[in-house]
C-alpha cells in the first residue's frame, strides 16, 4: 500500500515537471505576397500550414496549436472588447500601433509562450520546367517579451517526373520541402542538439621501470664524472 502511494506521488510530480518544461506555440495563418500565383485546385495556405504543423509538433517539449478565431479565449476577448475582430487576420508578424507584434498580442490572449507568423512570399508553377516553387518568410516570437527569437526565409521546389501530369504533385513536393526547412530552423532554436560530453583522456600512469632506469643511468654517469675528477 505504501509503495503504491509513493508511486502515485512520484508519477504526479514527474507529470507536473514535464508539463512545466513544455512550451506552447501558436501557429498563425500565413499572409500572401503579390507573387503568389492563384489557383482554384490547390489551397497553398492550408497545405503550407498543415505541412509546417507536422514538422513543428515533432519538436521536443513544444506543444503546437493552430490559431482559430473560434477559440474560447479569443471569443471572450472579442466580447469584452479586448481585441477587435479585424486584428485577427494576417499578417500577424506586423507591429501594432503601440509597437507590439500582433502575433504576441493575440498569443497573450491564448496564454501561450511562443508564436510563429509569416508570409507566403512566392508560389508558382512553371509548365516549361514542370516545376513548382514556394518561398515562405516568418518570425518566431516570444509572446512574453515580444522579442523575435529567429526570423526565417526558406524556399522549396518540386518537379514533375517524366511520367507525371498532375501539377499538384510538384506543388505538394515544394510545400513539403519548404516546411522541412522552416521546421529545421525553428527546431534548432527551440531544441538545439545536445552536445555529447567529450571523453576525458585516461590519466597515464607513470612508468616506474623507466624512471628507475633513468635514475640508475644518471647515477652511473655522475659517478664516472666524479671519479674521473679525482685524477
Residue ranges and their predicted role:
Residues 1-2:
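N-terminal secretory signal peptides that target proteins for export/translocation
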Residues 5-16:
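Bacterial N-terminal signal peptides
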Residues 7, 88-94, 146, 158, ...:
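Hydrophobic transmembrane signal anchors and adjacent membrane-proximal interface regions, especially
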Residues 14-16, 81, 191-192:
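Short, flexible coil/linker elements and helix-boundary hinge sites characteristic
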Residues 20-26, 32-35, 48-50, 55, ...:
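C-terminal/domain-edge helix-coil "capping" segments
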Residues 26-29, 64, 115-117, 150:
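Structural recognition of the beta-strand scaffold that forms the well-ordered cores
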Residues 38-115, 181:
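N-terminal segment of the mature soluble domain
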Amino acid at each position: 500500500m505504501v509503495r503504491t502511494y509513493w508511486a502515485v506521488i512520484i508519477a504526479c510530480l514527474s507529470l507536473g515537471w514535464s508539463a512545466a518544461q513544455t512550451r506552447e506555440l501558436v501557429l498563425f495563418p500565413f499572409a500572401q505576397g503579390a507573387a503568389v500565383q492563384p489557383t482554384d485546385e490547390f489551397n497553398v495556405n492550408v497545405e503550407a500550414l498543415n505541412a509546417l504543423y507536422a514538422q513543428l509538433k515533432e519538436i521536443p517539449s513544444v506543444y503546437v496549436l493552430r490559431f482559430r478565431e473560434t477559440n474560447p479565449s479569443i471569443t471572450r476577448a472579442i466580447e469584452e472588447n479586448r481585441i477587435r475582430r479585424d486584428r485577427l487576420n494576417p499578417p500577424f508578424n506586423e507591429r501594432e500601433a503601440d509597437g507590439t507584434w500582433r502575433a504576441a498580442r493575440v498569443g497573450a490572449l491564448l496564454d501561450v509562450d511562443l508564436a510563429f507568423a509569416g508570409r507566403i512570399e512566392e508560389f508558382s508553377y512553371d509548365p516549361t520546367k514542370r516545376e513548382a516553387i514556394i518561398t515562405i518568410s516568418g518570425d518566431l516570437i516570444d509572446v512574453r517579451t515580444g522579442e523575435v527569437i529567429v526570423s526565417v526565409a526558406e524556399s522549396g521546389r518540386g518537379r514533375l517526373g517524366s511520367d507525371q501530369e498532375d501539377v499538384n504533385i510538384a506543388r505538394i513536393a515544394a510545400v513539403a520541402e519548404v516546411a522541412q526547412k522552416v521546421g529545421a530552423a525553428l527546431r534548432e532554436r527551440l531544441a538545439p542538439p545536445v552536445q555529447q560530453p567529450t571523453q576525458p583522456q585516461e590519466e597515464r600512469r607513470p612508468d616506474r621501470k623507466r624512471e628507475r632506469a633513468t635514475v640508475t643511468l644518471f647515477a652511473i654517469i655522475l659517478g664516472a664524472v666524479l671519479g674521473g675528477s679525482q685524477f
